[in-house]
Amino acid sequence: MWIEIPECYEVLRNVFSKFRRHSLTAAMVKLLMRADTHVSFTVPAEEPVAKCTFSQVLAALSVSLGSMVVGFSSAYTSPALVSMKDRNITSFEVTDQSGSWVGGIMPLAGLVGGILGGPLIEYLGRKNTILATATPFIISWLLIACATHVAMVLVGRALSGFSVGVASLSLPVYLGETVQPEVRGTLGLLPTAFGNIGILLCFVAGNYMDWSELAFLGATLPVPFLILMFLIPETPRWYVSRGRDDRARKALQWLRGKKADVDPELKGIIKSHQDAERHASQSAMLDLLKKTNLKPLLISLGLMFFQQLSGINAVIFYTVQIFQDAGSTIDENLCTIIVGVVNFIATFIATLLIDRLGRKMLLYISDIAMIITLMTLGGFFYVKNNGGDVSHIGWLPLASFVIFVLGFSLGFGPIPWLMMGEILPGKIRGSAASVATAFNWSCTFVVTKTFADIIASIGTHGAFWMFGSVCVVGLVFVIMYVPETQGKSLEDIERKMCGRVRRMSSVANIKPLSFNM
């Protein structure tokens, strides 16, 4: 027996059908009304929905504390460079060039960490790889805090960036493999929320501490993360991949609760692994290039591309100028705090909505908000740079900027990382996540380093219009290619994307919710 809730869906379909005589409208309606575009609200009446356990929350919280260290590391240069440049020591002279490398070396090191992180999570395991990043984080911050030369800061930032690259890959994979489908969206966004807490903490502390004191604070953040990681298990799927089914059962029982029947889920994981093994080649890279695996990998790469080419780093870089053009008298450091607060609030909202609206709906909202605000910012700077009077709309850049950050943090900020841990097949999850993470950091470095050249070539207005145009293409990409994964187990997602339904018919009925992809 099935309970149909969204009657409005059928009403909308009937309304839109009246416009089928218009070919363009019909095409757009067909795309927007695709079954995997929206969340289905049909649930089997006889099957109770599993409840989230404290153990899952503890696991998500533990790894998310690592994300707070990542956020703190990413934001460090913004408040720290000012006090670094004020230090009157010849051996510690921070020029504009060396200062740019203090910030720029982290994404480069993150690229290396992203490449090596894939083999690490397959060889060491998801948990042990995350755990292994804590010590390098502490060492990197102590190097920076005790630095007597710029070179020590650069080494510390490089080590921190490497750890960030490894962590940004392994955190979503761990959560994707441990959290049950019904709450995977909410708990899966905890790393992003804690990452934004780390950013906000760095901005606030940077108002009262110099670069060295701020680095000492950074060295303390991995300690609670390190302690809590010892309390949680390795993922059941990694244990199964190593033939340790008994350990997988214990880990799954800990995560789902002592009274939970984990046999159906464990059998599904084992079946999925066996099926993947039958179709695996001797080379991990050859596995990536298989048609069945290439589709989810390309979708993940596409999401990473549109995340960074939305211009988020460019807009953050231009924060102070936007506030100045808005006629704001707010202190520059306070502006960065406002950015951190907006980031955190938006991500918190996303955690409440993602398991209700689904991934794609939040991506739609996010992309449309970014398109409107980027085009608006471009229009403002076009009028301003051509001698137009913008004094009466000095509030517009500030409003656009806040809405842009809100929109990004609702969807395209956290969801590409969340879906990376969901849609990549289990057999290649480590190597594919490594490729996706390295690609993301490459895009980050390119956008950050070329933004000034883009401004010089096509102007500020042209840069914002360019990023807005990329977001338009990104919206089409989401509509046409990105599947809805809300409420589905990883095995269900893999069967749908890789076309292995027939071989796994005995497991196909193990569904906590019923959805159409």
UniProtKB/Swiss-Prot annotation:
UniProt-listed InterPro entries: MFS_dom (IPR020846), MFS_ERD6/Tret1-like (IPR044775), MFS_sugar_transport-like (IPR005828), MFS_trans_sf (IPR036259), MFS_Trehalose_Transporter (IPR050549), Sugar/inositol_transpt (IPR003663), Sugar_transporter_CS (IPR005829)
Topological domains annotated Extracellular: 78-100, 157-158, 206-212, 318-333, 382-392, 459-461
Transmembrane segments: 57-77, 101-121, 136-156, 159-179, 185-205, 213-233, 297-317, 334-354, 361-381, 393-413, 438-458, 462-482
Localization terms from the record: Cell membrane
Membrane topology: Multi-pass membrane protein
GO molecular function, one term: trehalose transmembrane transporter activity
SUPFAM superfamilies, sorted: MFS general substrate transporter
Family: Belongs to the major facilitator superfamily. Sugar transporter (TC 2.A.1.1) family. Trehalose transporter subfamily.
NCBIfam families: SP
Name listed for the protein in its UniProt record: Facilitated trehalose transporter Tret1
Gene transcribed to yield this protein: Tret1
